[in-house]
């Protein structure tokens, strides 16, 4: 197939070639893989600035998406590639090929650098999903930083540069510029841009940005960062986001509050800390959805309000396909017990959904990530159980709200239990979206000028 780049794609290709260090923030559906591969091809065979390229990506993307893109496009036919996933023996066989491009999953970057026995002779690295390196304490981050000075060109690709706020940006940009813009040390970054938020005496559990932090941080990174939002460059369907509120009965409300107090009383000193907040909110989310795991692992049913709401939504859809996102295993069990649904797990499931053969499909956000195209099968997504992760939330929504969606409108419905933690999750997602949008807008490329 011949590649005829859109103007924004041509701009991004030129940007990558011009900037040895770059953060390329491309929204889902904008073709970041073909953009990167085209730039790599030119750097390898036109300007001869690069000799070997390493691509680091999530497993499914490394195994399936990158090889498929290389094979798809006519202008890339001279590229050789090897996929270093699977067993150590299979990975070593891939490395021995000395291909132009070696593609490895992010879980194995530490193995490659510290354990494989192969010299690290890649002069260009592409990180597909820069947010994979947001944790500066992770083994993959530390391993990559060890050999970072040997890398002449590095590109970070992501559509979600600050899913959980500004703090994540330090590690992501340290990988790229070795601390030139946001500082060499996380303590320095915290001191410059943040102040303690939640604390217990001398123990600080979280930080909040100083009033000037966002603008200052965005200015610091703007010279190596470009961003192009999907809605600016593609004919995207209209996105309609709605909330379907359900109300607990007085008895259920009392039980919810009682269980909440029990959970709090079980905490050390009755205090919610950063260490136990995740566990607590997880249990409250279960209650909001209608069931909770007991300490024995048994599922205790609490209410059917969300199931009732889902029944109403299915009926109102009038056989129009629905994609339902769940979070807990008991969500899935209860949905399956009540409705005739099918999980999206295999290639056959994906094909049948896109062919319109599945009236109601269920999917977990963690399995709805990169490279999963479901837009041909429907245009309505129902969130039965919410997630705190903006990255998973947006990736799941983008399975339907993307280029190629034939419906003029995509509807995202959230089933919210009033007076529960659901309302806080929706608010948190909104706040994170604002932070991320501010980042993207602050460093957006001006295509007319560029």
Feature-to-residue mapping (PLM):
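Conserved Helicase C-terminal RecA-like lobe
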Residues: 1, 17-18, 31, 35-45, ...
